């Protein structure tokens, strides 16, 4: 069994054609009934699931690159999730913010960007929809391409929520440029772009919050803080 250095929370291994994950709980993850994901043909086959360990079919594929074709597939698959009417766990978005803020307070970390946007983020949390099934963690590293298919992996944070959050999360985590974002959203379908913008701000805030709450700061959050400020200025102009 070979250990895999992937993800930041669980302990992951590969054994032959199986992807084995020892679950590490943080109060926000592994709430979903993973068996319901068999409704989607872009999720690897679930072999077994227990409180301690989950085992998936190993997908031997390649990294997903941003092209018009891949953006189309990702958009269509997200739309399929959002329209599926599957019952996911209740929205965990406000709880995630509360928990990360608590950790920062315990560590004595004061981040000016986080403090500046707290009231604005709370307003987003109050008003966001909480009824649609979401992946909630769609980084490119949580996808794999094989035989013209793109598989979505790592569903541990899946919950009900606002579709604009899922879309914004992918836009920001994949660092789509303006043209790529437009292509992606056009493939998805009719949307309220003001809500996309609001949730892009929320996603950047959440990424900054998350990385500062970790025992090891895995990456520099400066680009995310600069992007957050930029999008907030865009939002203010939008309101005017």
Feature-to-residue mapping (PLM):
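N-terminal non-globular leader segments, chiefly Sec-dependent signal peptides
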Residues: 1-10, 113-116, 186-187
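ATP-binding pocket architecture of kinase catalytic cores
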Residues: 2-91
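Hydrophobic packing residues in well-ordered alpha-helices of helical domains and bundles
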Residues: 71-74, 114-117, 201, 224-228
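Active-site Asp-x-Gly
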Residues: 146-194
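Helix-rich C-terminal or lid/interface subdomains of diverse kinases
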Residues: 187-240
């Amino acid at each position: 069994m070979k250990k895999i250095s992937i993800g930041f929370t669980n302990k992951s291994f590969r054994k032959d054609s199986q992807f084995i994950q020892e679950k590490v709980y943080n109060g926000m993850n592994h709430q979903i009934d993973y068996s319901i994901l068999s409704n989607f043909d872009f999720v690897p086959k679930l072999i077994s699931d227990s409180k301690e360990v989950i085992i998936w079919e190993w997908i031997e594929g390649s990294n997903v690159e941003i092209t018009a074709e891949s953006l189309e597939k990702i958009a269509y698959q997200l739309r399929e999730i959002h329209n599926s009417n599957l019952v996911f766990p209740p929205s965990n978005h406000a709880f995630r913010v509360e928990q990360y803020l608590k950790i920062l307070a315990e560590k004595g970390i004061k981040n000016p960007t986080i403090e500046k946007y707290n009231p604005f983020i709370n307003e987003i949390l109050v008003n966001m929809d909480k009824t649609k099934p979401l992946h909630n963690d769609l980084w490119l590293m949580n996808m794999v391409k094989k035989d013209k298919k793109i598989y979505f992996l790592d569903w541990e944070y899946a919950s009900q929520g606002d579709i604009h959050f899922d879309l914004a999360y992918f836009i920001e985590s994949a660092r789509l440029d303006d043209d790529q974002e437009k292509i992606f959203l056009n493939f998805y379908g009719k949307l309220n772009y003001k809500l996309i913008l609001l949730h892009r701000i929320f996603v950047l805030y959440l990424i900054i919050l998350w990385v500062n709450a970790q025992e090891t700061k895995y990456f520099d959050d400066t680009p995310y803080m600069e992007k957050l400020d930029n999008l907030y200025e865009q939002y203010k102009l939008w309101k005017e």
